[in-house]
Amino acid sequence: MNYTINENETLKKMTSPLANYIFNKKDGTMLTWGEDKDKEASRFPAPTILDIEVTTICKGGCPFCYKSNTSNGKNMSLENFKHILDIFPRTLTQIAFGADADLTANPDLWKMMEYAREKSIVPNITAAWFDEETADKLARYCGAVALSRYEHSKDKCYDSVKMLTDRGMSQVNMHFMLAEETYQQCLDTLGEIATDERLKKLNAFVILSLKAKGRGVGFHKCSQEHFNEIVNKAQDLHIRLGFDSCSSAKALEAFYFDENIEKCIISCEAARESSYINVDGKYFPCSFCEGTKGWEEGLDVLSCSNEEDFIEKIWNDPATLKFMEKLNNTTDKHGCRHCPIYKV
């Protein structure tokens, strides 16, 4: 393997010829660079970030769920989860758990998080709401937690934010799925963040751009004009903003006046740095490409027996490399990579 890992209780460092990082396991800060510190990493020798789906069961009923999840579904077993982490390259720094609205569907969720911690991997997760007992467990295991803001569960979302910040968590964010149909709700939410006492310790408001998949089909992407209006209002209210990498092109346009903004925004890293594994243990470059052309079936991670197997059969599989090449060919005038599947 053409990389080395060094770590202690606080920091994890990976060095390789074309991609390097320093990751702070305490606060989630991650610095990445390529051949030298002025260049972007071209591709990591193995994933540093893993999005893993541990259940398809969800009673949240969100109108634009791209997974189209319902109360009927299945869970990933603890055995399969452990196998995935056991064979995964040591480059991995953190996991984003894909679970259900209130984090009750998979009874092994907390054992999974505990196992990740044993391997010095930081668990992160997104929910819509939860109870006090769940908040205790999240504060114990997670580095960051995001609360999805839906109109039908707004107060439960805000209450859940306060539960975590009351427990001393600093990396508590709010996620908002932005489409033309939700644009006004987004503006209203910014106003509420500025005035609602439950949200006074919120870390950041994070915009997730629509990918028209699942129940999201029928929604329409937000215009650049409306996107800019949201950014401007957040700045006027002194609210910290974040974006998913899918929103990078719009964010660069919205912050055109800031000459340093390109240093702060990272475009799509699928098949370059990040990875996704579904509930069946199948790999896809990202969760949104599952079931799309060329990715009707994923790559079987459970068949891998060790780290070398994963790198050869999954990370360097021709299908993965083809996706990366297609993504790299979408680069625009800002050097920003655009989604090769959806119009975002």
Spans of model-derived segments:
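Radical SAM enzyme [4Fe-4S]-AdoMet core and its adjacent flexible, acidic
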Residues: M1-N2, K119, Y141-F284, F288-D309
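Flexible mid-to-C-terminal extensions adjoining Fe-S/redox cofactors in radical SAM and related proteins
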Residues: M1-T10, M14-N20, K26-T29, K282-Y283, ...
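Conserved alpha-helical substructure of the radical SAM core
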Residues: T4-S16, N24-R140
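Hydrophobic beta-strand positions
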Residues: I22-F23, Y276
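Short, intrinsically disordered, charge-biased short linear motifs at domain edges
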Residues: A46-E53, A249-F257, P318-N329
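Processing junctions and N-termini across compartments
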Residues: I52, T56-K59, E262, N329-K333
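Short cysteine clusters
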Residues: C58, C62-C65, C268, C286, ...
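Secreted/processed peptides and extracellular or luminal domains of membrane proteins
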Residues: F64, S68-S71, S274, T292-W295, ...
